[in-house]
Design a protein with these regions (language model features):
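Beta-strand signatures of extracellular beta-sandwich domains
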Residues: 46-48
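C-terminal motif of bacterial Sec signal peptides marking the signal peptidase cleavage site
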Residues: 14-16
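Tryptophan-paired
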Residues: 50-111
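Extracytoplasmic electrostatic interaction patches
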Residues: 90-169
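Bacterial N-terminal signal peptides
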Residues: 7-12
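Positively charged n-region of N-terminal signal peptides that target proteins for export
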Residues: 1-4
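Post-signal peptide N-terminal segment of mature Sec-exported envelope proteins
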Residues: 25-43
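Bacterial signal peptide processing site
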Residues: 18-20
């Protein structure tokens, strides 16, 4: 009985030491357009989901965005917090919106953000009773072909407003 208890304890300790892997299947819950330096808040938005690497040709899913919020509170990993402002778009009702797909965000039918190649990284935090805390962050991605490496917490998608593509009707 003691041997069985000892083996169970060793297996439990070894299992708790495994590093978690970043979950690319996790649903994206919000999109944050960073460096949103004006008080204007869009009236409507649309998110399109595309197969990864297909060049934004055939959307596989889409949804409307109805809830926008201008935030002046920086995220945990934001480098420059002076005059911080971002537009946060809450996302729901779309199952295919995850880090395995390319995403296009369209605001007011004129502002286009094509997001591709998101890279998730695991970050270790302070030690607690069970060991170090770990969580995933979006460490880099491409916005309209421009490399962007301002990290944000997982379940979010950071976009820089300076890479916007404007298309007039």
């Amino acid at each position: 009985m003691k041997k069985l208890l000892f083996v169970a304890l060793v297996v439990a300790l070894l299992a708790s030491c495994m590093r978690k892997k970043c979950n690319y299947n996790r649903k994206i819950e919000f999109i944050s357009v960073r460096e949103w330096r004006n008080a204007y808040c869009p009236h409507k938005g649309k998110i399109y989901v595309y197969k990864k690497g297909e060049g934004f040709t055939q959307p596989i899913d889409s949804t409307n965005v109805y809830h926008f919020e201008i935030s002046t509170h920086p995220f945990m990993f934001y480098k420059d917090t002076t005059n911080y402002s971002s537009l946060v778009c809450s996302v729901d009702m779309i199952d295919d919106l995850n880090y395995l797909h390319d995403v296009r965000l369209v605001l007011d039918d004129t502002l286009y953000y094509d997001v591709s190649q998101p890279k998730l990284s695991c970050v270790e935090g302070p030690w607690v009773m069970g060991g170090p805390t770990e969580w995933s962050i979006v460490s880099s991605l491409y916005v309209n072909g421009h490399y962007y490496d301002d990290p944000t917490v997982e379940r979010g998608l950071p976009i820089s407003h300076k890479f916007v593509r404007i298309q007039r009707k």
